[in-house]
Amino acid sequence: MSSLSTPASRPDGRGAGEPLLVLVDPAAGRADGESVRIARDVLCGGADAKVVLPESRSELDRVLSHRGRRRPVVIGSDQAVHKVLQALHRQRDLGTDPVGVVPVGPAGTVLACRALGVPEQPVAAARAVLGGAPRKLDLVVDDGGGVVITELRIGAEPRRALPSLRSLWAKQAAPDQATVPDPESTPMRVEADGRLLADVHERIRLLEARPAGGELELVIRTAGAERRLRVAALSVAGRSFGYSADGCPVGPVRHRTWTVHPGAWALLLPAG
């Protein structure tokens, strides 16, 4: 892992705001090194920024646990953001500081953060980190340690293509992640808040859940009906099924439970 610390000061001699820990996903550098360089230069020019390139999940955990007062900033894809949020959640440190994000990667790999309001261009995103305002957001956490920030989906066509760029942190943490199988070929049992919504004899065509207002907005579609409801927890069981978390494929697994954590984290977004 390499690192660079660049203290910054304003012309008037005052400090340049909150110190930052800038976490660069190595996969982002391979995908678009110029955007990474631009974002790093803007961040280092406006704050006391320590730039690190963790090369494994253990290194990511270590730098986050020793960051002190520095706010974490992710330069990378949605999947890289997932891994940082997972690490902070494991360390019970998720709500301590707002998280900054500079999305870097192919278009299909950064749509979740953009959907939350993060600017598309690296300069604008970096400026939002430096001068933006934190916005509290719900986080969906599963019993395997994964997270969802915008959308969980099983079945039907995803709203966007699955990403081809894999975060190095994700590769080290979950080498078995693959494509999402067709749920109609896999009998599944679905429960929400302890209530049975679909049993194994029903073929699920679509299950979609999004965090909203401290709950999950759930859509479940079978051959005969579609149900919409708001729940706090969702459980799915089957012989082998996959799903997408913010477009990132996960699985196959046999059981998964997702729980909403209201206002669990804060994202730095453009002020106003």
Predicted segments with their positions:
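Small-residue-rich beta-alpha loop regions that form the catalytic core of phosphotransfer
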Residues: 2-153
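A broadly tuned "polar low-complexity/structure-edge" signature
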Residues: 1-8, 17, 140, 162-187, ...
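ATP/nucleoside-binding phosphotransfer catalytic cores, i.e., glycine-rich phosphate-binding loops
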Residues: 2-8, 205-272
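A generic structural signal for short, solvent-exposed coil/turn residues
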Residues: 14, 43, 66, 91-93, ...
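Catalytic core of DAGKc-family lipid kinases
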Residues: 93-217, 221-223
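N-terminal start-of-chain detector that recognizes signal peptides
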Residues: 23, 45-47, 72-74, 111-113, ...
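Short, acidic Gly/Pro/Ser/Thr-rich loop/turn segments
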Residues: 29-30, 156-157, 265-267
